[in-house]
């Protein structure tokens, strides 16, 4: 029997399988990318999911989360052997209920082996992203309160370290593989941050009832839901501009971004139409809606007019909130 190191196909098969287990959305969107980009983006998502799992562990103190985050980052940056992270992390998460995420942590060596088969440029971009996210989350571990983050500035910073930086990473990887996109995005890299932040704001608003139940809020204190939805709409406008900069010949990249963007638009619109909700399942898009929109992206991703029309129609309720 081959050792894991001799079987890169088995590693990639694991990456594909676990991606489907830990994220229905990204299991749908990531395979739309060209194969070389699909591998590194899928790999990055799993690394970020490990960071996220540490953050979500309600039983752990902020100092324990910070210690585990540092061990993980050291393993990613090859400063220490990966088992110096895996063993203490599994021990700390012995009461953690999500078995798929625990399995992902067990397979951290597999995920890192895949990372090291990517190009040097892509590896550098991933390491930067995971470093900023891990350090940023460690900083925010000490700010977990029921009241929420201090102000909008702190909220923006949180959204940057958990998602804006992913927008930057995607832009770097897309640019590494598409010289035309690299040329078009030059000077407008801030749109990439807004793209990531729009997706993160969607998650924060959607997950707020569950966060509240475990004594945490990632929303800024003393800022209304309406104001947050207006900010999210502005981020979506920038995200739209980002998507339209992607060359039509890079159709897989366009479709990947448009699918994630569209699901966020529809979810935020549902939030805008629900004055009160007690569980994120109330905002969940139906399977039929997701499949129908997936089919629509295949038609619309190369058509700027259709993308703009979708945005205009799907965000009417958000736009009303933004109007005086």
Q: Residues of each region from the PLM?
A:
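Catalytic cores of Mg2+-dependent Asp-rich isoprenoid enzymes
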Residues: 1-199, 205-324
């Amino acid at each position: 029997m081959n050792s894991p190191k001799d079987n890169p196909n088995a590693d990639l098969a694991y990456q594909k399988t676990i991606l489907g287990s830990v994220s229905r959305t990204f299991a749908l969107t990531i395979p739309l990318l060209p194969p070389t980009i699909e591998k590194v983006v899928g790999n990055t998502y799993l690394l970020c999911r490990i960071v996220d799992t540490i953050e979500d562990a309600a039983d752990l103190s902020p100092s324990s989360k910070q210690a585990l985050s540092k061990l993980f980052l050291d393993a990613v940056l090859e400063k220490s052997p990966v088992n110096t992270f895996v063993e203490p992390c599994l021990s700390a998460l012995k009461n953690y209920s999500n078995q798929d995420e625990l399995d992902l942590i067990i397979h951290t060596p597999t995920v890192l082996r895949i990372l090291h088969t990517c190009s040097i440029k892509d590896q550098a971009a991933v390491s930067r992203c995971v470093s900023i996210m891990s350090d940023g989350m460690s900083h925010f571990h000490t700010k977990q309160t029921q009241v929420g983050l201090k102000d909008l500035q702190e909220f923006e910073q949180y959204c940057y370290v958990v998602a804006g930086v992913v927008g930057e990473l995607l832009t770097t990887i897309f640019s590494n593989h598409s010289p035309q996109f690299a040329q078009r995005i030059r000077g407008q890299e801030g749109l990439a941050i807004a793209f990531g932040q729009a997706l993160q704001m969607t998650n924060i608003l959607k997950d707020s009832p569950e966060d509240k139940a475990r004594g945490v809020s990632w929303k800024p204190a003393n800022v209304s839901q309406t104001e947050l939805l207006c900010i999210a709409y502005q981020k979506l406008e920038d995200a739209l501009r980002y998507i339209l900069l992607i060359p039509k010949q890079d159709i897989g990249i366009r479709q990947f971004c448009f699918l994630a963007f569209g699901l966020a638009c529809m979810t935020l619109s549902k939030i805008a139409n629900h004055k009160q909700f007690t569980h994120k399942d109330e905002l969940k898009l139906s399977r039929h809606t997701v499949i129908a929109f997936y089919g629509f992206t295949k038609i619309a991703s190369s058509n700027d007019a259709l993308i703009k029309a979708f945005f205009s129609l799907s965000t009417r309720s958000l736009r009303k909130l933004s109007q005086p």
